Amino acid sequence: MVKSSQYLRKMNFKNYKNKKVLIIGHSGFKGSWLANWLIELKAKVYGISKKSINRSQTYVSTKLNKRIFKEYDFDIRNYKKLNRTINQIKPDYIFFLAAQSLVGKSYKDPVTTWQINFVGALNILDVVKNINFKTNLVLITSDKCYENIGKKSGYKETDLL
């Protein structure tokens, strides 16, 4: 059996050096780790998030706000700002990690959760569909998108959503 670390050794991480990388949701748990990693790889990292959202411990402890190339503060439901920002940056790579991910909050405010998670993702897809430059888009979600069937192990890509 091949271990994932063997795949990592074969991957070409030099692709990110001097590239413009936009992370939407860069101040969250996964986004701040990704931003720090890409900065170490010498990428020019841009970030979009809302300042009213709590910053992750990683974001705070690594002083990401001082190391990132540029941060933008707005809600991903704002299509015009998202479109303008992406067309201004012209990123080589876009990582979409923004979401309202708190399960308890989603039960208390399902409409806002739906708008952020679904409309936000639709906005990024539509903007990228209509740009006139090449970019690479990676949308990252959570295991909460899978049907909760009480599995003891992790989910597989073939599991029901």
For each predicted feature, which ranges?
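N-terminal Rossmann-like NAD(P)+-binding domain of SDR-like oxidoreductases, especially those catalyzing
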Residues: 1-161
